[in-house]
C-alpha cells in the first residue's frame, strides 16, 4: 500500500498512512497527528504549531512516519510510480527488470584510515545503474542509508552505513529504519545488498534507556528472517554486533565479500587490546615498554583479523578489488535470481519491538 498524503490525516485517520508500506508527504500541506495543536493545548497545556505537532518535515525527519518529502502533488504521484517500479505485482513473482545502464560515477577513493569519514552515496553511485537509486527515509536516521536501485537492470534493496553521519554507528532509529526496509524487501522478493562500514551499535546510558538492545535485536532479527538473496560487502570495517546487523558471515548470507584491507572482528584493535590486556599493560611501569608492548599486541591482533587470512579460512567468500566489485555483484545476483525459496511449515517470528 502506498500513501501519498496531500493534506491532514488526524486522530484515527492518522493510522491509515501508518499502516501503509510507504508514505509520501507534501511539504507544507501534509500532516498527521492523533490530537490537534488546539486539543493539545486544552488537554495537556502544550502550545505547539501544526508543523511541530505532525507536519511533513517533522514526520520525515524526526518520527520516521513519513518516507518521502515532496514539494508538489505531481511530484508525489510521480515518486509513487517510481517507487512501485521496483516491485512485482505479486509476491509470487520476481521484481521487474529494466534496461541495464552503466554507473554514473567512478569508484571513489576510500580513506585508508577507517576512522575518517566518506560519503557512502558516492560508492553506491559507482555500483548501481545510473539514476536508479531511490533513497528511502533520506531525512531520518541519516547514519544509515536504505533504498532501492538497479544493478544491471535488476532491482535490489540497499542497506548501507553512512560514515559521514555519526561515524556510521547504529542508533535506535537507524535500527528501526533498517528492520522496516529489510522486511519490505523480504515481503516482495527484492534481493538485498549490504554495504558495511560500521564501528558497531552506540553505547551509553542514553541509548540504553532508549532501548538500543531491543532495537538492535529487531534489526538483527530482520536480517536473519530475510529469505531473499543477500550479499554483504565489507567496505572498510565491521565490528561487534554491527557485523551481525549488516548480514556478516555468522548469518550466512549468500556471499560475504570484502574490499582489500577491510576488517571484521568483535571490536577494533585498540578497543580489543584495552579490553583483553588492560591489566597486563597497566602492570608495566615503564611507559616506553608499555607502549612497545601495546604496539606488539596491536600488530598481533591485526594479523589475526587480516582479511586474506579470514578468506583462507572461508569466513569471507571473496576479496575483490574496488574496480571489480560491480561486475562481481552483477554476476552473483544473476546466479541467485534462479534460486527457489523453500518455505518452512510455520514461519512466525516473535520480533523485538
List PLM regions with ranges.
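Ligand-binding clefts of soluble mixed alpha/beta catalytic domains
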Residues: 1-353
Amino acid at each position: 500500500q502506498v500513501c501519498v498524503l496531500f493534506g491532514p490525516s488526524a486522530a484515527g485517520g492518522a493510522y491509515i498512512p501508518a499502516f501503509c508500506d510507504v508514505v509520501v508527504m507534501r511539504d507544507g500541506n501534509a500532516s498527521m497527528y492523533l490530537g490537534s495543536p488546539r486539543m493539545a493545548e486544552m488537554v495537556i497545556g502544550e502550545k505547539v504549531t501544526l508543523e511541530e505537532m505532525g507536519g511533513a518535515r517533522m514526520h520525515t525527519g524526526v518520527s520516521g512516519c513519513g518516507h518521502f518529502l515532496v514539494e508538489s502533488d505531481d511530484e508525489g504521484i510521480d515518486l509513487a510510480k517510481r517507487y512501485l517500479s521496483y516491485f512485482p505485482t505479486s509476491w509470487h513473482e520476481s521484481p521487474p527488470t529494466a534496461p541495464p545502464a552503466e554507473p554514473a560515477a567512478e569508484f571513489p577513493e576510500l580513506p585508508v584510515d577507517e576512522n575518517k569519514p566518506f560519503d557512502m552515496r558516492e560508492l553506491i553511485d559507482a555500483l548501481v545503474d545510473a539514476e536508479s537509486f531511490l533513497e528511502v527515509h533520506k531525512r531520518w536516521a541519516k547514519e544509515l542509508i536504505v533504498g532501492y536501485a538497479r544493478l544491471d537492470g535488476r532491482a535490489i534493496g540497499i542497506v548501507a552505513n553512512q560514515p559521514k553521519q555519526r561515524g556510521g554507528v547504529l542508533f535506535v532509529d537507524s535500527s528501526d529504519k533498517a528492520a522496516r526496509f529489510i522486511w519490505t524487501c523480504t515481503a516482495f522478493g527484492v534481493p538485498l545488498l549490504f554495504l558495511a562500514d560500521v564501528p558497531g551499535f552506540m553505547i551509553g546510558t542514553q541509548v540504553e534507556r532508549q532501548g538500543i538492545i531491543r532495537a538492535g535485536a529487531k534489526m538483527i532479527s530482520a536480517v536473519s528472517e530475510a529469505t531473499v538473496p543477500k550479499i554483504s560487502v565489507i567496505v572498510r570495517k565491521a565490528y561487534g554486533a554491527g557485523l551481525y546487523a549488516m548480514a556478516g558471515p555468522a548469518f550466512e548470507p549468500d556471499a560475504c565479500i570484502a574490499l582489500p584491507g577491510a576488517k571484521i572482528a568483535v571490536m577494533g584493535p585498540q578497543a580489543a587490546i584495552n579490553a583483553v590486556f588492560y591489566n597486563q599493560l597497566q602492570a608495566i611501569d615503564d611507559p616506553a615498554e608499555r607502549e612497545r608492548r601495546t604496539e606488539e599486541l596491536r600488530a598481533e591482533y591485526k594479523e589475526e583479523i587480516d582479511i586474506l587470512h579470514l578468506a583462507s579460512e572461508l569466513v569471507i567468500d571473496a576479496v575483490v578489488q574496488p574496480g571489480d566489485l560491480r561486475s562481481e555483484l552483477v554476476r552473483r545476483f544473476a546466479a541467485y535470481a534462479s534460486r527457489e525459496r523453500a518455505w518452512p511449515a510455520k514461519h512466525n517470528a516473535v520480533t523485538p519491538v
